[in-house]
């Protein structure tokens, strides 16, 4: 598999490893990005890859609670300018109301729902908005929590929309707890909510990486396989702390020093009740959507070639 300079740059952004080592990793793995990350880790050159995929799409990742129903939704626009207009934000907020009240099964079903305060469908309203704002707009995804207690958090004007769902006992107000957990999610972007949810395949993969790392370490290479496996198993706790929300160090150390799970239990106890983390939704604006990147040099070369004909 061939790879490009952009692939080398992306691997560097994911791993914080130098360009030349990233190039070697891609050469050794035939351009496979995931295998290249593992190759660098096994050589001791990189830690687990950051979730640093370039996000270029504009719009808003939004979360709210409507009549007790938690809603997270992402709506994309062509430019950041359009996303910051009152008209666009009103659209997003009303779409969240539709999701909460009409419970559409998917995006297509949402488009067919009646828009609040009108007899028009969501599709018809969006067509009007496209004409008035002058940009294409798309509903990308949404989710809802109709049960338990939901707490919403929107970071930096809609770059992150986080919805946390909690089981609350004792009649306490868990809003602050939920908000602090949501801020943790936005800041640390955990891959899993709890270590019990990590697929066995991922656990096995991490074990293999740790064993390979020891095989490449002159001080560890000669140790028996069973010893390496025990050491690797011990390192899984570090993996869980890096990747699992409830096992992560709570970022607000001014409030609590320990894990997120410990913070939730401690904060609830101080309020005279009990709170259990149930689920969460974390939308990052434009996550996974790649905009076309213009190659200015290639564009100029093409224009010169065209002019020469």
Feature roles, as predicted:
Residues 2-309:
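N-terminal assembly/interaction segments in proteins that build large macromolecular machines
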């Amino acid at each position: 598999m061939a790879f490009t300079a952009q692939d080398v740059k992306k691997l560097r952004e994911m791993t914080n490893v130098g360009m030349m080592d990233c190039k070697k990793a891609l050469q050794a793995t035939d351009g496979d990005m995931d295998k290249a990350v593992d190759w660098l880790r096994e050589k001791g050159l990189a830690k687990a890859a950051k979730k640093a995929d370039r996000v270029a799409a504009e719009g808003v990742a939004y979360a709210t609670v409507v009549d007790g129903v938690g809603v997270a939704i992402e709506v994309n626009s062509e430019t950041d300018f359009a996303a910051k207009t009152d008209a666009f934000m009103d659209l997003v907020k009303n779409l969240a109301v539709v999701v909460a009240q009409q419970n559409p099964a998917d995006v297509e079903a949402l488009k067919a729902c009646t828009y609040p305060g009108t007899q028009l469908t969501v599709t018809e309203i969006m067509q009007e908005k496209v004409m008035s704002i002058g940009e294409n707009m798309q509903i990308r995804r949404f989710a809802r929590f109709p049960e338990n207690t939901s707490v919403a958090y929107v970071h930096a004007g809609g770059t992150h929309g986080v919805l946390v769902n909690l089981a609350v006992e004792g009649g306490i107000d868990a809003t602050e707890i939920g908000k602090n957990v949501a801020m943790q999610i936005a800041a640390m972007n955990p891959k899993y909510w709890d270590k019990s949810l990590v697929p066995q395949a991922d656990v096995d993969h991490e074990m293999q990486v740790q064993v390979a790392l020891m095989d490449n370490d002159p001080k560890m290479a000669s140790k028996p396989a069973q010893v390496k496996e025990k050491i690797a198993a011990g390192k899984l706790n570090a993996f869980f702390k890096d990747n699992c929300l409830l096992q992560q160090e709570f970022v607000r150390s001014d409030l609590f020093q320990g894990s997120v799970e410990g913070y939730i239990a401690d904060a609830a106890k101080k309020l005279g009740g009990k709170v259990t983390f149930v689920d969460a939704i974390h939308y990052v604006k434009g996550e996974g959507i790649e905009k076309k990147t213009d190659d200015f040099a290639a564009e100029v070369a093409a224009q010169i070639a065209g002019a020469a004909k």
